């Protein structure tokens, strides 16, 4: 994926407070360094109407990510967990609205199975609505035991944003009756 994205994509995938707290803006340009490749993967569909018969689209990406990590963080959060550049794997699904929660569940179960297959002690946490980012409908975290820190640390999260990004990016599909709907 590209390492930078245009402002219209950034505004389509996240709220302004999140953007201000996370994103590095390129001075004098309408460009931002990516905070996650998820944004560029979904952003590639801006202003598109997809063929509903070809949904779902499942995509994955591994990329460097750049974040301000603005805010007051404790000493325990220094190092690999609160750095300005890191590598990250992302998965997204573009699907019909009625399939969204099933895909969320599949991605979540696959993620849990992956960490369990490594025989790492893990626990699953469903995020309460007060902890969700502005556009998220539902989100869960996987935490794995860190022997070095002697505590569980977040290693994965899975979220669904409902139609929030599709609405903001104008990402649609034509159904079997030729009707245009949000993806």
Q: How should each PLM-predicted stretch be described?
A:
Residues 1-183:
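TRNA-recognition modules of translation machinery and tRNA-sensing kinases, especially anticodon-binding
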